[in-house]
Amino acid sequence: MEALPLLAATTPDHGRHRRLLLLPLLLFLLPAGAVQGWETEERPRTREEECHFYAGGQVYPGEASRVSVADHSLHLSKAKISKPAPYWEGTAVIDGEFKELKLTDYRGKYLVFFFYPLDFTFVCPTEIIAFGDRLEEFRSINTEVVACSVDSQFTHLAWINTPRRQGGLGPIRIPLLSDLTHQISKDYGVYLEDSGHTLRGLFIIDDKGILRQITLNDLPVGRSVDETLRLVQAFQYTDKHGEVCPAGWKPGSETIIPDPAGKLKYFDKLN
């Protein structure tokens, strides 16, 4: 007996059954990507959601339920405590002009070298302005400050030329270094490959070019100028006197002689 055609398996008055038979055939003929797109296509973020999502993570941690965040991917850092700081050079904006800058320009001085995610953002201008406003305090202890991001020098200059009341920097006293190739950020282990910018990394480099301190912040929280000053002062004290600084040490506070007998002098006073 001759086999009936597929579409002849039902009578004309069974249209619903005929459509059910056709559905698997249509799904088989559709490209796989088209079917997958029905399940995986993401809804575009609204303007309100965009305001809560910035630089690879939420600006406000409490808003985490609004938008999912991919895991960050960091490069292996060449920056190691007590070792020479990774060399860098590039174009910076200094006093409104483009100038070439390199790490060795600061040999003989301490250097606070910090990364921030992006120009024209939220927390970043508050940090740069805070460090810039207190530059003389750093210079009084033979220390300079340089800020760096993956933006171009042209974007840096545009940000500097934007008034502070509009989220700009205005006249700023510290150099803004451009890391457009991302190489400096990668060498220092702060570059987020999945986001195209950096974490808030801060590095204290001593007058011999040795890296003494590393701080890494996630994106929503800025850094403390007071704590950075304290750390520089503490490292400089130990360099000069050979004694070590206890927790919370500030200039004028007691230090510890680092040997079994010498330490007793400090702990006897403390207790």
From Swiss-Prot:
Which interval of the chain is the signal sequence? Answer: 1-37
Q: Which Pfam families match?
A: 1-cysPrx_C, AhpC-TSA
Which one GO biological process term can you cite for this protein? protein maturation
**Residue ranges of domain Thioredoxin in the record:** 79-237
> From the Swiss-Prot or TrEMBL record, what is one GO molecular function term?
thioredoxin peroxidase activity
Question: PTM per UniProt?
Answer: The enzyme can be inactivated by further oxidation of the cysteine sulfenic acid (C(P)-SOH) to sulphinic acid (C(P)-SO2H) and sulphonic acid (C(P)-SO3H) instead of its condensation to a disulfide bond.
**Location within or outside the cell:** Cytoplasm; Endoplasmic reticulum
Catalytic positions are 124
What are the entry keywords? Antioxidant, Cytoplasm, Disulfide bond, Endoplasmic reticulum, Oxidoreductase, Peroxidase, Redox-active center, Signal
Using the UniProt record, give the first listed, main subcellular location: cytoplasm
EC number, UniProt record: 1.11.1.24
So which domain of life are we looking at?
A: Eukaryota
As its record notes, the protein acts as a catalyst of:
a hydroperoxide + [thioredoxin]-dithiol = an alcohol + [thioredoxin]-disulfide + H2O
> Looking at the UniProt record for this protein, which Gene Ontology cellular component terms does it annotate, in alphabetical order?
cytosol; endoplasmic reticulum; extracellular exosome; extracellular region; ficolin-1-rich granule lumen; nucleus; secretory granule lumen
Biological role? Thiol-specific peroxidase that catalyzes the reduction of hydrogen peroxide and organic hydroperoxides to water and alcohols, respectively. Plays a role in cell protection against oxidative stress by detoxifying peroxides and as sensor of hydrogen peroxide-mediated signaling events. Regulates the activation of NF-kappa-B in the cytosol by a modulation of I-kappa-B-alpha phosphorylation.
Q: How does it assemble?
A: Homodimer; disulfide-linked, upon oxidation. 5 homodimers assemble to form a ring-like decamer. Can form heterodimers with PRDX1.
Its family remark reads: Belongs to the peroxiredoxin family. AhpC/Prx1 subfamily.
Q: What else is known?
A: The active site is a conserved redox-active cysteine residue, the peroxidatic cysteine (C(P)), which makes the nucleophilic attack on the peroxide substrate. The peroxide oxidizes the C(P)-SH to cysteine sulfenic acid (C(P)-SOH), which then reacts with another cysteine residue, the resolving cysteine (C(R)), to form a disulfide bridge. The disulfide is subsequently reduced by an appropriate electron donor to complete the catalytic cycle. In this typical 2-Cys peroxiredoxin, C(R) is provided by the other dimeric subunit to form an intersubunit disulfide.
The name this protein goes by in its record: Peroxiredoxin-4
- Protein's organism: Homo sapiens
Its lineage opens with: Eukaryota, Metazoa, Chordata, Craniata, Vertebrata
Q: What is the primary gene name for this protein?
A: PRDX4
